[in-house]
Amino acid sequence: MRQEQTLFSRPLPIALFILIALAADQFIKYLVEAYLPFQQGVPVMPMLALYRTYNYGVAFSMLSGMEGWFIVGIRLAVVTFVLWLWRRTPKDRFFAHLGYAMIIAGALGNLVDRLLFGYVIDYILFYTATWSFAVFNLADSFITVGAGAIILDELLQAKKERSLKL
């Protein structure tokens, strides 16, 4: 039986998606660097501010004390692993392939920052009067939403397999 190919299971669409997402991430970071004051909140709406800061580590500033090339190596290993998963995943799994594309785009967006500046530019802050979430960026959002898409795909696949057994 022939598997139906989803859009992001093909190399050209995934490459275009990644390039467009990477360009959007880098353009926004350029604007943030050019116009947003450093470590001063600019309220956008209740509980959301723009707040430019630099992350010298990985997610939530973990590993910020590590050598920069070690972190670059980790990011390259993640991209390589996700590409490997993308190639091995059945071609009919739309959300998984979309998730892989988003994770790759996000990892590359932060990798470009790391290579150019030695840190990642973060600028989105959710907060209340007594609490604030870690400052993050569009690339981080791609990674998070991409992981969610992969989990959704797994849940849908499990449901599909259960319904076929009935």
From Swiss-Prot:
Quickly give the catalysed reaction: Release of signal peptides from bacterial membrane prolipoproteins. Hydrolyzes -Xaa-Yaa-Zaa-|-(S,diacylglyceryl)Cys-, in which Xaa is hydrophobic (preferably Leu), and Yaa (Ala or Ser) and Zaa (Gly or Ala) have small, neutral side chains
Q: Name one GO biological process term.
A: proteolysis
Q: Which UniProt keywords apply?
A: Aspartyl protease, Cell inner membrane, Cell membrane, Hydrolase, Membrane, Protease, Transmembrane, Transmembrane helix
The pathway is:
Protein modification; lipoprotein biosynthesis (signal peptide cleavage)
Q: Which residues of this protein are catalytic?
A: D122, D140
Q: Which NCBIfam families match?
A: lspA
Q: Which species is this record about?
A: Rhizobium meliloti (strain 1021)
List the InterPro entries. Answer: Peptidase_A8
The name of this protein is Lipoprotein signal peptidase
The membrane spanning regions, by residue number, are 12-32, 66-86, 92-112, 138-158
The UniProt entry's sequence similarity note says: Belongs to the peptidase A8 family.
What subcellular locations does the record give? Cell inner membrane
List the GO terms this entry assigns under cellular component, sorted alphabetically. Answer: plasma membrane
Q: Which GO terms describe its molecular function?
A: aspartic-type endopeptidase activity
Q: What is its EC number?
A: 3.4.23.36
The domain of life is: Bacteria
Physiological role: This protein specifically catalyzes the removal of signal peptides from prolipoproteins.
Keyword Transmembrane in record: yes
Lipid bilayer topology: Multi-pass membrane protein
